[in-house]
């Protein structure tokens, strides 16, 4: 058993008491990102090693793997703790997003180790989508690079407010303060173009040698700030979803018998109480909460992030993809939106194309109307383009086949974030964050029967070359 884990269990008075204590610790999700070979995997390995989170058999295996695949000579190659794919070990790089878990006396952590190569930017965006903090590694010898800027921008685009700029490999520049100061100034100059509400911190360190990772460095006495671990343990994470109105996307209709009908999902934001009046979108029908069912039994109130099943007092038509919110809240469904897109496919994104889109539990089709601009990650300027290439980031105008209940992504990532799915291969080809909503066309001016709407959708889906217009919106072909 891990020695520090055994000591923690003993200090708490047994396994059960230790598990209860773990449940009450706050959780921080963070990712490491930056350019290739900046030392992201090594840093995570060092964090795990210096916090004594590695079991004896893992340490023994690491010694053997370091001899076969290591890139650090006689030293332990801590990056091998994270780089698990055979291709990663052979090339000495990270390709996939690797997740690791550890805890200290103050906090629990989930780490996402993301790749640095530009062609794997899509993997980095995937890792960043669930994180609260980003560690941006910079090689002290190279300074701020294009990929550093790209990852910084993607992190802020995905709503991350806390950035820790870890200037790594200080041992290779003789721990010089002027090198740290120069890179810090360069990054702050670039960061002037990022959102103004960011919490940016700088830590000089050496992941290989352990300087300023979990313990203060004797080689950089000119630095009086906290170590990286101290920053992670003390950073104050304020979750925006706790302060946002109630949003409950229905993932599953739970009907185990004739006497029970519940609507299961994860509460995306806000809170809900028994007896509270709620409204169902897109239908607009209202009811009230009769029960809040959880794995541990019924509750009187649930908060954001909890997996629950809601039982209502009325039998109303609710299905997967519907959204429940407080009855006094106003959220008008929209068919048109401007979306920040991170494109992840070899085939460029271009106007006129149609994709399936998935938002929470809702799946529908969307058409690309226009690309307003692509963002140049070197200087964050906007440029006109006809298409968005692989790993490109831009603002795109879209029209959905049906009105959707959407929020702005920065206000609610669950109901404001979506993915693009190729209709033929069923592969995820892009990620989108709602920037602007346009409610025009959300309600049709002409009433059509259910049969007419179903027939129209059938024709547009299976016979796109007929160029049939969408009865619920603008005239266009459903390509």
From Swiss-Prot:
Taxonomically, the superkingdom here is Bacteria
User: Where in this protein does the record put region G4?
Assistant: 168-171
Q: What is its EC number?
A: 2.7.7.4
Q: Provide the residue span(s) of the region labelled G2.
A: 92-96
Q: Where in this protein does the record put region G1?
A: 34-41
Looking at the record, the residues that make up the tr-type G domain are: 25-239
Which processes are annotated in GO (biological process)?
hydrogen sulfide biosynthetic process; sulfate assimilation
Q: In which residues is GTP bound?
A: 34-41, 113-117, 168-171
Stated family: Belongs to the TRAFAC class translation factor GTPase superfamily. Classic translation factor GTPase family. CysN/NodQ subfamily.
Q: What is this protein called?
A: Sulfate adenylyltransferase subunit 1
What gene does this protein come from?
Answer: cysN
């Amino acid at each position: 058993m891990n020695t520090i884990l055994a000591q923690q269990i003993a200090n708490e008075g047994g396994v059960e008491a230790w598990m209860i204590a773990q449940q009450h610790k706050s959780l921080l999700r963070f990712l490491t990102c930056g350019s290739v070979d900046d030392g992201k995997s090594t840093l995570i390995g060092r964090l795990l090693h210096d916090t004594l989170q590695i079991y004896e058999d893992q340490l023994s295996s690491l010694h053997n793997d370091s001899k076969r695949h290591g890139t650090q000579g006689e030293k332990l190659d801590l990056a091998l703790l994270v780089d698990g794919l055979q291709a990663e070990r052979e090339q000495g790089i990270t390709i996939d997003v690797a997740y690791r878990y550890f805890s200290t006396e103050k906090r629990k952590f989930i780490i996402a180790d993301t790749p640095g190569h530009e062609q794997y930017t899509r993997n980095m965006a995937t890792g960043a989508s669930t994180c609260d903090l980003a560690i941006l590694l910079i090689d002290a010898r190279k300074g701020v690079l294009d990929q550093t800027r790209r990852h910084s921008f993607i992190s802020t685009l995905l709503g991350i407010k806390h950035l820790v700029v870890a200037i790594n490999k200080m041992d290779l520049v003789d721990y010089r303060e002027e090198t740290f100061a120069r890179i810090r100034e360069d990054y702050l100059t670039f960061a002037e173009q990022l959102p103004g509400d960011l919490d940016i911190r700088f830590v000089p360190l050496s992941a290989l040698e352990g300087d300023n990772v979990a313990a203060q460095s004797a080689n950089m006495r000119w630095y009086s700030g906290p170590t990286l671990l101290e920053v992670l343990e003390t950073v104050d994470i304020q979750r925006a979803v706790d302060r946002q109105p109630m949003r409950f996307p229905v993932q599953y209709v739970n009907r185990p018998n004739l006497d029970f009908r519940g609507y299961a999902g994860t509460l995306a934001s806000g809170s809900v109480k028994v007896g509270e009046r709620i409204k169902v979108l897109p239908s607009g029908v209202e009811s009230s909460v009769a029960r809040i069912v959880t794995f541990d039994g019924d509750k009187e109130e649930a908060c954001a992030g909890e997996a629950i099943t809601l039982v209502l007092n009325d039998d109303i038509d609710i299905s997967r993809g519907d959204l429940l919110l407080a009855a006094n809240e106003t959220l008008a469904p929209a068919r048109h939106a401007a979306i920040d897109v991170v494109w992840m496919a070899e085939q460029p994104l271009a106007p006129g194309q149609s994709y399936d889109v998935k938002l929470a539990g809702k799946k529908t089709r969307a058409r690309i109307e226009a690309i307003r601009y692509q963002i140049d990650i070197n200087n964050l300027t906007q440029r006109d383009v006809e298409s968005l290439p692989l790993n490109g980031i831009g603002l795109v105008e879209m029209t959905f086949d049906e009105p959707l209940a959407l929020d702005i992504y920065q206000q609610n990532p669950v109901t404001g974030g979506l993915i693009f799915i190729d209709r033929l291969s069923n592969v995820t080809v892009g990620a989108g964050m709602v920037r602007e909503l346009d409610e025009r066309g959300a309600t049709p001016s002409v009433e059509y029967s259910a049969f007419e709407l179903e027939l129209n959708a059938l024709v547009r889906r299976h016979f796109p070359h007929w160029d049939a217009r969408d009865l619920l919106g603008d005239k266009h072909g459903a390509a």
